[in-house]
C-alpha cells in the first residue's frame, strides 16, 4: 500500500463545516488597530462605516444583518456538529467578504492611520482555500460597493473584461448562487446580453449567430413565447428545470459570440502586429 504524504492527508481531512466555524472564530478576534483602539472587523464597520455603506438598507448594524441572513443560526449548527448546506456556507462567506471590503475601502480612503493586524491574513487565506474547495470565486464591484460569489467560469470572466462595467456586472451576476432557479432574473440578464450580441452580426460565424438568434427569440427571452403571436406550444408544458438548462446554454452561446467578436475586432490585429515583428 502506497503511503500518502501529510499534504494529501491534510487535503482529505478538509471539512467545509469546520472551516466555517474556524472563520467565525477568527471574525471575533481583533484585526484592526486604530490609534489605541483594537477592533474586530465588525466592530470597526459598526462604529465607522455601516451607515455609510450603500447596501446597508434598513439594517442597523452587522448583528442585525447576520440575524436576517440566518448566519447566526448557521454558526450555531456548525458549533453543535450539525451539517449545513453549501448555500448557507456561501451566504456566510459573502457576508464576511463584504465586511472585509468595507474595512479595506475605509482604511484606504478615510482611516488611513488604521492598519490590519496579524489574524487578518489568516482570515483571508482560509476564505480563499474554502472558496477554492467549493469552486467559487469572489468579485469586487466598486461602483456597487459589493462583493459577490460566483462559480468559476473562465469564459464569463474573459467577457467581463471586454464589455462595459454595467454589462460586466450582469455577466458575472448570472453565475451567482442565489440566481439558481430564478428564471426571471436570468431572463433579464440574457435580454441585456442579447442586445449586445445583436450588434456583432457581421463579425460572427453565421451558424453561431443563427443559433444565438433562434435561442434568444424562441425560448421566452426576448419575446413572450407563452402566449400571443409568438407562442411556442412546447414551452407551455416544459419544466422550469429544463427551461433553466436552456437559459444556461443560451448564456454560454452569448459568451462565445462576444469572445468571437473580440477576437475578430481586436485580437487578430494584435496577432498581425506580432507576425510583422517575429519572422
Please annotate each region the language model reported.
Residues 87-105, 195-199, 248-260:
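Short, hydrophobic/amphipathic alpha-helical patches that form generic packing surfaces
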Residues 168-197, 201:
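A mid-sequence, solvent-exposed acidic-amphipathic segment
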Residues 191, 201-279:
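Alpha-helical oligomerization segments
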Residues 65-80, 166-181, 230-237:
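Short amphipathic alpha-helical segments and their helix-coil junctions
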Residues 86-169, 175:
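Helix-loop junctions and short alpha-helical segments
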Residues 1-127:
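Charged interaction/catalytic cores of defense and host-pathogen modules
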Residues 81-84, 115, 180-188, 242:
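Conserved aromatic-histidine-acidic binding/catalytic patches
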Residues 85-95, 119, 185-192, 211, ...:
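Residue-level detector of well-ordered alpha-helical segments, enriched
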Amino acid at each position: 500500500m502506497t503511503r500518502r504524504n501529510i499534504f494529501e492527508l491534510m487535503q482529505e481531512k478538509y471539512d467545509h463545516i469546520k472551516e466555517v466555524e474556524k472563520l467565525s472564530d477568527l471574525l471575533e478576534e481583533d484585526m484592526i488597530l486604530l490609534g489605541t483602539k483594537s477592533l474586530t472587523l465588525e466592530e470597526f464597520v459598526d462604529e465607522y462605516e455601516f451607515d455609510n455603506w450603500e447596501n446597508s438598507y434598513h439594517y442597523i448594524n452587522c448583528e442585525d444583518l447576520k440575524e436576517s441572513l440566518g448566519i447566526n443560526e448557521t454558526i450555531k449548527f456548525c458549533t453543535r456538529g450539525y451539517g449545513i448546506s453549501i448555500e448557507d456556507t456561501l451566504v456566510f462567506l459573502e457576508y464576511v467578504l463584504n465586511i472585509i471590503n468595507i474595512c479595506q475601502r475605509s482604511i484606504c480612503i478615510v482611516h488611513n492611520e488604521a492598519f490590519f493586524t496579524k489574524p487578518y491574513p489568516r482570515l483571508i487565506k482560509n476564505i480563499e482555500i474554502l472558496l477554492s474547495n467549493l469552486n467559487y470565486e469572489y468579485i469586487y464591484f466598486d461602483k456597487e460597493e459589493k462583493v459577490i460569489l460566483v462559480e468559476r467560469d473562465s469564459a464569463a470572466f474573459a467577457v467581463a473584461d471586454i464589455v462595459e462595467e454595467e454589462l460586466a456586472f450582469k455577466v458575472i451576476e448570472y453565475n451567482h448562487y442565489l440566481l439558481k432557479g430564478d428564471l426571471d432574473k436570468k431572463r433579464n440578464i440574457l435580454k441585456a446580453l442579447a442586445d449586445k450580441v445583436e450588434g456583432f452580426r457581421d463579425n460572427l460565424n453565421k451558424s453561431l449567430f443563427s443559433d444565438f438568434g433562434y435561442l434568444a427569440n424562441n425560448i421566452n427571452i426576448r419575446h413572450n413565447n407563452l402566449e400571443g403571436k409568438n407562442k411556442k406550444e412546447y414551452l407551455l408544458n416544459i419544466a422550469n428545470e429544463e427551461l433553466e438548462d436552456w437559459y444556461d446554454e443560451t448564456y454560454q452561446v452569448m459568451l462565445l459570440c462576444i469572445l468571437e467578436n473580440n477576437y475578430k475586432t481586436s485580437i487578430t490585429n494584435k496577432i498581425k502586429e506580432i507576425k510583422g515583428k517575429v519572422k
